[in-house]
């Protein structure tokens, strides 16, 4: 069930327009990619389907230009419509088995897991990677369960697919996440809320290399 190309999950950017403080979304993402972001997830919880689709199309062109994967949050239809690299879902979304069936065997399927049981089930049903968190307090998602670094280590040792730590990750704690066994870190505000996303991404990328 693995994608044909091995994916680099080191620095995983999840988008959130509300953090841009007047900056342009595409320009900020491009700057972050130049700084070391290796994969981008488009998350548009407030957008209409039309806006989500148009944004995804534009972002697909950008990520293709830099040869990095575009993952779509939640919306299987958008992921298929723009031929994104994959889809990311969680416990409240489409069941993993059905998502995998509709997505096909060669697209990347990510799943948000907050327990060992969720992680094991997701792997068994076809997930290619796991987003594990929230590891630290976060303002970008209100409905998250808290996950300890010890649990992240336990999940990492129990599954064979990559693990991406998420939730309140910043320059100050990124190294802890990597040293706990995560294959990468997923960040939102640590890049997008900053005045210079490229510099923020570069500093975080350096943290991911200290394994």
UniProtKB/Swiss-Prot annotation:
EC number(s) per entry: 2.5.1.3
Binding-site positions, 2-[(2R,5Z)-2-carboxy-4-methylthiazol-5(2H)-ylidene]ethyl phosphate: 138-140, 168, 188-189
Domain of life: Bacteria
Xref: Gene3D superfamilies: Aldolase class I
Pfam family membership, one: TMP-TENI
Keywords: Magnesium, Metal-binding, Thiamine biosynthesis, Transferase
InterPro entries (alphabetical): Aldolase_TIM (IPR013785), ThiamineP_synth_sf (IPR036206), ThiamineP_synth_TenI (IPR022998), TMP_synthase (IPR034291)
S-S bridge residues: none
Ligand binding (4-amino-2-methyl-5-(diphosphooxymethyl)pyrimidine): 41-45, 73, 112, 141
Co-factor remark: Binds 1 Mg(2+) ion per subunit.
Protein family per UniProt: Belongs to the thiamine-phosphate synthase family.
Designated name of the protein: Thiamine-phosphate synthase
Originating organism: Alkaliphilus metalliredigens (strain QYMF)
């Amino acid at each position: 069930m693995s994608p044909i190309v091995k994916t680099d999950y080191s620095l995983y950017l999840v988008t959130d327009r509300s953090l841009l403080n007047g900056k342009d979304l595409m320009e900020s993402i491009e700057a972050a990619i130049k700084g070391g972001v290796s994969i981008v997830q488009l998350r548009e919880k407030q957008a209409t389907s039309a806006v989500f689709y148009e944004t995804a199309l534009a972002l697909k062109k950008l990520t293709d230009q830099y040869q990095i994967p575009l993952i779509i949050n939640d919306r299987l239809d958008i992921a298929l419509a723009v031929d994104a690299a994959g889809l990311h879902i969680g416990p409240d979304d489409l069941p993993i088995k059905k998502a995998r069936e509709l997505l096909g065997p060669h697209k990347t399927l990510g799943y948000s897991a907050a327990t060992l049981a969720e992680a094991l089930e997701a792997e068994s049903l076809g997930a290619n990677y796991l987003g594990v968190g929230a590891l630290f307090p976060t303002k970008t998602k209100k409905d998250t369960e808290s996950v300890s670094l010890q649990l992240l280590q336990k999940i990492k040792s129990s599954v064979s697919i990559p693990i991406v730590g998420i939730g309140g990750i910043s320059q100050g704690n990124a190294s802890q996440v990597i040293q706990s066994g995560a294959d990468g870190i997923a960040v939102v505000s640590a890049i997008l809320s900053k005045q210079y996303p490229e510099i923020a991404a570069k500093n975080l990328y350096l943290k991911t290399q200290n394994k």
